[in-house]
């Protein structure tokens, strides 16, 4: 099981830590999407920026 993550809000005017998390996950501009593995590290990062993203579960 993987997670499809889409950035739905801009990182402008956000805390630097939140901007770094978005960049580390491979997200760039609004509406950019990445597929990430479903593990504890990924879920922890997603919780920190939950207000900026949408997450869907996808099968491999």
UniProtKB/Swiss-Prot annotation:
Keywords: Ribonucleoprotein, Ribosomal protein. GO terms for biological process: translation. The keyword Ribonucleoprotein applies. The keyword Ribosomal protein applies. Disulfide bonds: none annotated. Signal peptide: none annotated. InterPro entries: Ribo_uL30_ferredoxin-like_sf (IPR036919), Ribosomal_uL30_bac-type (IPR005996), Ribosomal_uL30_ferredoxin-like (IPR016082). GO terms for cellular component: cytosolic large ribosomal subunit. GO terms for molecular function: structural constituent of ribosome. Pfam families: Ribosomal_L30. Part of the 50S ribosomal subunit. Belongs to the universal ribosomal protein uL30 family. HAMAP family: Ribosomal_uL30_B (MF_01371_B). This is Large ribosomal subunit protein uL30. It comes from Lactobacillus gasseri (strain ATCC 33323 / DSM 20243 / BCRC 14619 / CIP 102991 / JCM 1131 / KCTC 3163 / NCIMB 11718 / NCTC 13722 / AM63). The gene is rpmD.
